[in-house]
């Protein structure tokens, strides 16, 4: 019979298999809806690339360091740099990977001419082809050395200003954001030695209970 009630439980994150929400974050919106509360914008979900274990968004410098996207068989064998099948050249692929760092989350307007095509390609690789996708920070996309001159000006100038226009993805990530590497190491994944499995994950719900 109270006049106001604060129902701070979070959204129904547990309804998605691939989710960046903490595993125990089930949400209790349904209980309020069953009790008669009205919902609003419940279909407005955001999706983006995130690591599977631990659950964490791989935006920002994780992408701007330009890691390789590898597709593997379920047992980890048969690694393939599958993005090369979709981009005309390694430079175009790298530019899309770099932009994924700040064009977040998935945006339908950025599929044809933006980085959201990466979200679609990861989804197709994992859910349609039944493979796994990992980020490899130990080798440059396309193999060989980073060709900074082939990057679009925004990416090249950003990396140059950050003192990270060199080396391998892990070298660039350590230069730009060492805590990003420490975060995974403290949770059992050493990016200096091993790849990071990712998926297209539910990341945020813009709706909830109508107030």
Residues covered by each model-derived region:
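FAD-site-proximal beta/loop scaffold in flavoenzymes
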Residues: 1, 193-211
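Predominant activation on well-ordered alpha-helical scaffold segments within soluble catalytic domains
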Residues: 3, 26-33, 177-185, 206
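Glycine-rich loop(s) and the adjacent beta-strand/alpha-helix scaffold that form part
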Residues: 4-57, 69
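Short, glycine-/Ser/Thr-/acidic-enriched flexible segments
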Residues: 7, 11-13, 74-77, 140-142, ...
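Glycine- and acidic
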Residues: 11-14, 161-166, 193-195
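Short, surface-exposed linear patches
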Residues: 26-31, 61-64, 92-93, 194-196
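Hydrophobic alpha-helical segments, especially N-terminal targeting/anchoring helices
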Residues: 35, 71-72, 209-210
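An anion/pyrophosphate-binding glycine-rich loop and adjacent beta-alpha core
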Residues: 38-190
């Amino acid at each position: 019979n109270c006049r106001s009630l604060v129902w701070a439980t979070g959204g129904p994150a547990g309804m998605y298999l691939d989710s960046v929400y903490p595993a125990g974050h089930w949400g209790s919106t349904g209980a309020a809806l069953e009790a008669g509360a009205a919902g609003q914008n419940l279909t407005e979900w955001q999706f983006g690339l995130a690591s599977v274990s631990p659950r964490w968004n791989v935006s920002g410098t994780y992408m701007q360091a330009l890691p390789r996207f590898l597709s593997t068989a379920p047992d980890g064998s048969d690694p393939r740099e599958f993005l090369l099948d979709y981009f005309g050249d390694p430079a175009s692929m790298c530019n899309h990977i770099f932009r994924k760092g700040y064009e977040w989350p998935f945006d339908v307007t950025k599929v044809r001419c933006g980085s959201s095509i990466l979200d679609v390609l990861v989804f197709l690789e994992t859910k349609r082809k039944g493979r796994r996708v990992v980020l490899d920070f130990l080798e440059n996309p396309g193999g060989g050395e980073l060709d900074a001159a082939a990057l679009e000006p925004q990416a090249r100038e950003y990396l140059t200003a950050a003192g990270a226009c060199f080396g391998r993805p892990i070298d660039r990530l350590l230069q730009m954001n060492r805590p990003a590497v420490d975060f995974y190491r403290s949770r059992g994944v050493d990016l200096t030695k091993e790849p990071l499995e990712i998926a297209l994950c539910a990341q945020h719900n813009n709706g909830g209970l109508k107030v």
